[in-house]
């Protein structure tokens, strides 16, 4: 399923309720097409690993985050230098980063989804449909943008309290040198996992399985899932649909570099 997201301008609590319109992102997309929810019979098939589809997307994502942090630093330092009370513009930063991440997500999910279809033996021109993912990607990237910016704001507030304005550039130096790479790797791992699972669901509804592959320094809950296999349209034992799934909030998804493999059974 395409799970509800904790965050984003269109979302309110509880996590699976949207403001008006559809009840949740699960109301649209390939998960609502009458899939056979019985576990597919085991059969030999081609496995596709999401990590194999990432290409240079982590580098592109890191570049986008670095640019965001630099743009943010210029604006924040200018406002602090002018002794302005409103030195932090959360709506602006959330909007700008969400737009950057959505453009990135749309491009990488389309490329990886098409490639996953091809590797699974299907024709992406017939069996892959990016528009079916776009509403969900918009919700995901809004949530991710807010999480990133809230972390930056908290770090700036802590530095201002301890060292004053002079310490603020260190927040952005660390963001560019450390957070950008880690955040980019986690974001692309999540998008790759989503694209791979979604490709299997679109191309062969009710016929795919997915397997959790633990990454580096995993959470204990994620380590416990290493090798866990489930039908592609159901959740893993933790309630996550794939690595990086933000449905359960940043505590279960932020920084996650686990991946997934999918297989079509016949």
Model regions and ranges:
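N-terminal leader/targeting and assembly helices and adjacent pre-domain segments
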Residues: 20-208, 232-235, 263-266
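Short amphipathic
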Residues: 209-215
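Pocket-edge structural micro-motifs
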Residues: 1, 214, 262
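Short Cys/His-based metal-binding microdomains
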Residues: 217-266
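A residue-level signal for conserved active-site and pocket-lining positions in enzyme catalytic cores
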Residues: 1, 184, 222
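Charged substrate- and nucleic-acid-binding regions of tRNA-handling and nucleotidyl-transfer enzymes
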Residues: 2-26, 252, 260
């Amino acid at each position: 399923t395409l799970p509800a997201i904790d965050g984003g301008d269109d979302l309110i609590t509880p996590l699976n309720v949207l403001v008006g319109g559809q009840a949740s992102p699960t109301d649209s997309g390939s998960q609502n097409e009458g899939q056979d929810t019985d576990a597919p019979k085991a059969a030999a098939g081609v496995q596709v690993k999401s990590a194999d589809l990432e290409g240079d997307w982590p580098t592109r994502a890191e570049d986008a985050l670095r640019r965001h942090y630099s743009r943010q630093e210029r604006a924040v330092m200018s406002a602090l230098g002018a002794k302005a009370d409103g030195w932090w513009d959360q709506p602006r930063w959330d909007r700008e980063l969400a737009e950057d991440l959505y453009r990135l997500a749309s491009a990488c999910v389309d490329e990886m989804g098409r490639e996953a279809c091809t590797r699974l033996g299907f024709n992406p021109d017939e069996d892959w449909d990016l528009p079916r993912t776009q509403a969900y990607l918009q919700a995901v990237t809004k949530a991710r943008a807010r999480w990133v910016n809230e972390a930056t704001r908290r770090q700036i507030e802590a530095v201002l309290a301890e060292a004053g304005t002079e310490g603020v550039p260190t927040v952005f130096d660390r963001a560019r040198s450390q957070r950008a790479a880690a955040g980019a790797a986690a974001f692309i791992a999540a998008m790759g996992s989503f694209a791979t699972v979604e490709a299997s669901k679109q191309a062969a509804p009710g016929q795919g399985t997915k397997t959790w592959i633990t990454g580096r320094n995993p959470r204990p809950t994620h380590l416990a899932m290493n090798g866990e296999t489930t039908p592609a349209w159901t959740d893993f034992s933790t309630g996550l649909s794939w690595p990086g799934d933000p449905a359960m909030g940043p505590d279960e998804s932020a920084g996650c570099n686990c991946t997934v493999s999918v297989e079509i059974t016949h």
